[in-house]
A protein has these predicted regions:
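Extended, well-folded catalytic/binding cores that form a central cleft or groove in large enzyme
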Residues: 1-189
């Protein structure tokens, strides 16, 4: 199976290989999916990839294998819901889509020292990057941070600029104001 994180408990007679992400190859795969399968299939794959399900990688792999098998480009691959992998990817994508739409209405920002807005969330799925466009359009003239406490990731927006994702971040706000703003200012750099 294809896992996106190292397993908590290892199995006997199984070999594990860690494969680093190659951004160049990832970009080529993205463009190929968009050009040959279309934006609807691409969106479903991206949504499923944001799922917290451990087997999402395997399901996505088999859907893409089916779509490109034998040199063909099956643009309607996501309509083959009788296929267990296609069905799984469709269900994962729907679950992720519902969750991030839910968060569009329920993310609450609080002002920190009059300098930026902060919202903390704990979504079940990894939806932070999916929220970037919505909130940057909604608050284009604000400095804001949406912090995923579960994954220790922050989506940072500086007034008039593009969103930036920061990983491995810990944000703690004990009161309504923060004395040392240095740690927060580093998020935008």
């Amino acid at each position: 199976s294809i896992q996106t994180s190292f397993p908590v408990s290892m199995e006997l007679f199984t070999s594990y290989r860690e494969i680093a992400t190659d951004q160049s190859k990832a970009g080529k795969v993205m463009r190929t999916i968009l050009m040959r399968l279309g934006s609807e299939v691409y969106e479903q794959i991206c949504l499923a990839a944001a799922s917290a399900d451990e087997d999402r990688g395997t399901a996505i792999y088999y859907v893409l294998h089916r779509a490109f098998w034998g040199g063909r480009c099956e643009k309607r691959v996501m309509e083959a819901l009788a296929d267990p992998y296609v069905s799984r990817v469709a269900k994962l994508a729907l679950c992720v889509k519902r969750e991030y739409h839910h968060y569009f209405g329920f993310v609450r920002f609080r002002e920190i020292s009059g300098r930026f807005l902060l919202a903390k969330i704990q979504p079940g799925n990894d939806i932070l990057s999916l929220m970037a466009l919505h909130f940057s359009n909604r608050f284009p003239n604000e400095n804001w941070v949406i912090y995923d406490e579960k994954r220790q990731k922050a989506l940072c927006h500086e007034k008039g600029k593009e969103c930036v994702m920061r990983k491995g971040v810990r944000i703690q706000v004990p009161g309504s104001t923060v004395g040392d703003m240095g740690e927060y200012e580093e998020l935008w750099q």
